[in-house]
């Protein structure tokens, strides 16, 4: 069985849908952050697949930049969640309604 571009795009779409469903359905900020990372990894998978099957390495280079930005996003996101937890003692998205501490 030959694994083609369609298989990778379908897998990427499924991962993206799982991440989107997690963001919509869950209310915990840490879970929302993890689901956002799943969505970014789905986009990375699609970029690498298109890059591989079109014999162009620019998509793979772009993935390295996306991974770098995602790592910075996780660091800032977790720092914000920890700061909010110290003040509000919760990580539920609906409990955090004020824009300032």
Curated annotation (Swiss-Prot):
Keyword Translocase: yes
Location (main, coarse): membrane
Cross-referenced Gene3D superfamilies: 1.10.287.3510
Membrane topology term: Multi-pass membrane protein
InterPro entries: NADH_UbQ_OxRdtase_chain4L/K, NUOK/Mnh_C1-like
Top enzyme class: translocase
Catalytic activity: a quinone + NADH + 5 H(+)(in) = a quinol + NAD(+) + 4 H(+)(out)
Tree of life domain: Bacteria
Keyword Glycosyltransferase listed: no
Localization terms from the record: Cell inner membrane
One GO CC annotation: NADH dehydrogenase complex
GO molecular function, one term: quinone binding
Annotated Pfam families: Oxidored_q2
Enzyme Commission number(s) from the entry: 7.1.1.-
Function according to Swiss-Prot or TrEMBL: NDH-1 shuttles electrons from NADH, via FMN and iron-sulfur (Fe-S) centers, to quinones in the respiratory chain. The immediate electron acceptor for the enzyme in this species is believed to be ubiquinone. Couples the redox reaction to proton translocation (for every two electrons transferred, four hydrogen ions are translocated across the cytoplasmic membrane), and thus conserves the redox energy in a proton gradient.
HAMAP family listed in its UniProt record: NDH1_NuoK
NCBIfam families: PRK05715.1-2 (NF004320), PRK05715.1-3 (NF004321), PRK05715.1-5 (NF004323)
Subunit structure as annotated in this protein's UniProt entry: NDH-1 is composed of 14 different subunits. Subunits NuoA, H, J, K, L, M, N constitute the membrane sector of the complex.
This protein's name: NADH-quinone oxidoreductase subunit K
Organism field: Methylacidiphilum infernorum (isolate V4) (Methylokorus infernorum (strain V4))
């Amino acid at each position: 069985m030959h694994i083609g571009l369609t298989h990778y795009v379908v897998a990427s779409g499924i991962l993206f849908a799982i991440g989107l469903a997690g963001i919509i359905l869950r209310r915990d900020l840490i879970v929302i952050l993890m689901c956002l990372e799943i969505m970014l990894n789905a986009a990375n998978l699609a970029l690498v697949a298109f890059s591989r099957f079109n014999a162009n390495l620019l998509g793979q280079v772009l993935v390295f930049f996306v991974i770098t930005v995602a790592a910075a996003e996780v660091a800032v996101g977790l720092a914000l969640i920890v700061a909010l937890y110290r003040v509000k003692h919760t990580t539920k998205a609906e409990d955090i309604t004020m824009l300032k501490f």
